[in-house]
Amino acid sequence: MDTKTVVNALWLYDDLLDLYGDWGNLLVLKSYFGKMNIEFNIIKKSIGDDFDLEVADFVYIGPGKFKNLCAASRDILRYKDDIKDAIESGKCFLVTGNARLMFGNSFEDTGKNLYEGLGIFDYTGHESGNVKISDVVAFPVYSETPLKSYGFINRTSYIEGN
């Protein structure tokens, strides 16, 4: 018997946080899941929309212009406890680019205006207004064995802390 499994991906702030076509991350996942006969549903939610983390197997938040990130950050705070609980229970989140700023304690713009973060990680984000482009080599903290990862950075923000 051929059983088809379903994965529900919750894409938060798809209309605001999709800089550089990061939508491609989800298309790649959809393609690979499809090859394994797993249906990959994408549920899009944005500012003012209610969402249920319980129905999502996977949550994606991409990068965006800083003003869009600020708007999304004000909205996502209403789910602060739900997001913390979901992460602590093992829910999978893929947060790319400057969207990671929302998961720290706070972040600030170039004028030093402070925005509250979700407080998942103990860091503070800063928007510099200057573009930094470079290659990066990293060793993910979640790997029990050294796992060398290569990437590319194109950013205007940075974090301080862990």
How does the language model describe each region?
Residues 1-85:
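N-terminal beta1-alpha1 cap of cysteine-dependent amidohydrolase-like domains
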Residues 16-19, 66-68, 125-128, 158-161:
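Short, acidic Gly/Pro/Ser/Thr-rich loop/turn segments
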Residues 1-11, 127-162:
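Amide-donor transfer/coupling interface in amidating biosynthetic enzymes
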Residues 14, 45-47, 62-64, 96-99, ...:
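Fold-independent oxyanion-binding glycine-rich loops
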Residues 34-38, 88, 123, 159:
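Generic secondary-structure signature for well-ordered alpha-helical cores
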Residues 20-26, 56, 105-106, 110, ...:
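Surface-exposed loop/turn and secondary-structure junction residues enriched for glycine/proline
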Residues 66-146:
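Cysteine-nucleophile active-site neighborhood
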